[in-house]
C-alpha cells in the first residue's frame, strides 16, 4: 500500500540491528504493521483506535486552511463506514501515531522532490484524502477478520514525570559507558535545514553560516578553560555530541547570545521567536518542555507505551523491546503511541543521531535522548511487577507552571508594543 516511506534512510541504515535498505526500499524501512484496538457492541464493530506511524504532512506549509491531513481523513472515512455498518451515530475512529519520527506520507527515492512538487494546491488535499483512505481501509479490513484477539483482564496504569535534561543513562543503553547524561534541550542546525521533501527549511547559504557560527562558538568555549562556565559547556558538548547547536533552549541563548540577536530574515522560526521575545512573552518561560510525562497503560495482557515525542522506527522498536523485557511474564504484546500527553521534539537512536539529519537535529536532549527514554521506561515498567501498594516511583516531579504574565503576551504574531498582529 503506497502510504509511507522512510525519509531519513542514511540515518536508518546506521543502526546496527537493521537490514540495510536501498533508495528503492524506503517503503520497507518502516514499521509496516498497524496495531488496532476495536470496540464491539452486540458482535458489531462500534469504534476503534489505530496505531500506525506516518507523518501528517501530506499538506505543505504554503496552504492557509486548517486541515486534519491524512489522519483526519482516515478517521472521517472510517467513521462514515462504521455509520453505515452499525446504523449508529456514535461510532468513533481514532487514527493515532506510532513510530512516525522518520516516516513520511510522501514518496522518498529517486526524483523525490520533483514528484512532491507536482502535488500542489487542491491536489495536496486529494493526496491527503487518498492516504487517509488507505489507512482506514486497512484498519477496517483487519478488524472485520474473525480471528481478532479478545482482550480480557484488569486495567492498570502508571504516569510519572521525568526531567529529560538531567537523566543519568543506564550503562546497558550507553554501550557500557558510565556516567553518560542528557543535557538542556538544544536545537541543531539540521532543525533549521528542514526535511528534504516534507518541509524544506532555510536556504543552504544560511544553513552554511549557521554551521560555521556554531562550530566557532564551540571552539571558543572549549578553548577558554579558565571560564566560569567551562565545565558547564564541556558537559553540554559531551552530551550533545556531533550536533552543531544553534539554540540552547534551556539557557535562552541563540549562538551564545540573546534570543533576538539573529535577524528575522534568516528563518521563519527565528523571526517568530524575535517577535515573541521583543513582546516579553518568552524571556523567562521554558522554550520547550523539559519535564515530560511518561506513561504505561496495561489492559489485560496488552501494554501501551505512551511516549511524548516523535520517535523513529528503530528507536520505537528498541523502546518496545526494553519495556517488553520487563513485562514478559504479564503481557503478550507491547504497543507504542507517540505524540502522547505532551510534545518534546524527536527521539532518534544513538546511531541515527550521529547522522544529524533533521530528526537528529531536533533530538533536543543530546545523543543519549533515546537511551534516557529506555532508562526511565525500564524503571517504570518494573513497577508493574510489584503490587500497587508497594510501588515506589517519582510521584513528585512536575513541570513548572507557565509564567502567566508572559502567557498573556503570547500571540501567533506578536510585536514589542501590543503583542498582536497589526495589519
Regions found by a protein language model. Name each.
Residues 1-423:
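Non-catalytic substrate/cofactor recognition surfaces at enzyme active-site rims
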Amino acid at each position: 500500500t503506497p502510504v509511507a516511506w522512510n525519509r531519513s534512510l542514511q540515518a536508518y541504515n546506521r543502526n546496527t540491528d537493521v537490514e540495510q535498505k536501498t533508495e528503492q526500499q524506503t517503503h520497507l524501512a518502516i514499521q509496516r504493521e498497524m496495531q488496532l484496538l476495536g470496540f464491539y457492541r452486540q458482535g458489531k464493530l462500534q469504534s476503534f483506535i489505530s496505531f500506525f506511524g506516518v507523518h501528517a504532512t501530506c499538506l505543505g506549509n504554503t496552504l492557509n486552511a486548517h486541515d486534519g491531513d491524512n489522519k483526519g481523513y482516515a478517521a472521517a472515512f472510517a467513521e462514515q463506514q462504521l455509520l453505515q455498518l452499525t446504523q449508529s451515530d456514535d461510532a468513533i475512529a481514532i487514527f493515532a501515531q506510532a513510530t512516525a519520527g522518520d516516516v513520511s506520507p510522501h514518496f522518498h527515492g529517486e526524483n523525490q522532490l520533483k514528484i512532491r512538487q507536482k502535488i500542489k494546491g487542491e491536489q495536496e488535499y486529494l493526496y491527503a484524502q487518498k492516504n487517509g483512505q488507505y489507512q482506514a481501509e486497512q484498519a477496517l479490513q483487519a478488524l472485520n477478520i474473525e480471528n481478532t484477539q479478545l482482550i480480557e483482564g484488569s486495567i492498570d496504569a502508571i504516569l510519572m514525570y521525568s526531567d529529560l535534561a538531567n537523566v543519568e543513562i543506564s550503562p546497558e543503553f550507553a554501550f557500557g559507558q558510565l556516567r553518560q547524561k542528557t543535557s538542556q534541550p538544544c536545537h541543531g542546525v539540521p532543525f533549521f535545514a528542514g526535511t528534504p521533501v516534507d518541509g524544506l527549511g532555510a536556504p543552504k547559504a544560511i544553513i552554511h553560516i549557521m554551521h560555521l557560527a556554531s562550530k566557532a562558538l564551540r571552539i571558543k568555549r572549549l578553548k577558554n578553560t579558565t571560564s566560569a562556565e567551562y565545565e558547564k559547556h564541556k558537559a553540554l558538548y559531551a552530551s550533545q555530541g556531533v550536533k552543531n547547536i544553534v539554540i540552547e533552549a534551556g539557557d535562552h541563548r541563540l549562538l551564545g547570545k540573546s534570543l533576538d540577536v539573529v535577524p528575522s530574515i534568516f528563518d521563519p522560526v527565528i523571526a517568530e521567536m524575535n517577535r515573541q521575545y521583543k513582546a516579553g512573552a518568552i524571556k523567562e518561560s521554558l522554550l520547550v518542555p523539559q519535564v515530560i510525562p511518561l506513561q504505561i497503560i496495561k489492559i489485560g495482557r496488552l501494554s501501551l507505551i505512551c511516549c511524548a515525542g516523535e520517535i523513529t522506527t528503530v528507536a520505537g522498536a528498541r523502546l518496545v523491546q526494553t519495556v517488553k523485557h520487563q513485562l514478559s511474564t504479564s503481557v503478550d504484546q507491547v504497543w507504542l503511541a507517540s505524540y502522547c500527553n505532551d510534545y518534546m521534539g524527536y527521539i532518534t537512536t544513538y546511531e541515527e543521531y550521529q547522522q544529524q539529519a533533521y530528526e537528529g537535529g531536533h533530538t533536543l536532549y543530546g545523543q543519549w535522548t533515546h537511551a534516557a527514554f529506555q532508562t526511565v521506561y525500564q524503571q517504570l515498567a518494573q513497577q508493574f511487577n510489584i503490587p500497587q501498594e508497594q510501588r515506589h516511583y517519582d510521584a513528585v516531579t512536575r513541570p513548572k507552571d507557565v509564567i502567566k504574565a508572559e502567557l498573556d503576551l503570547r500571540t501567533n504574531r506578536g510585536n514589542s508594543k501590543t503583542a498582536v498582529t497589526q495589519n
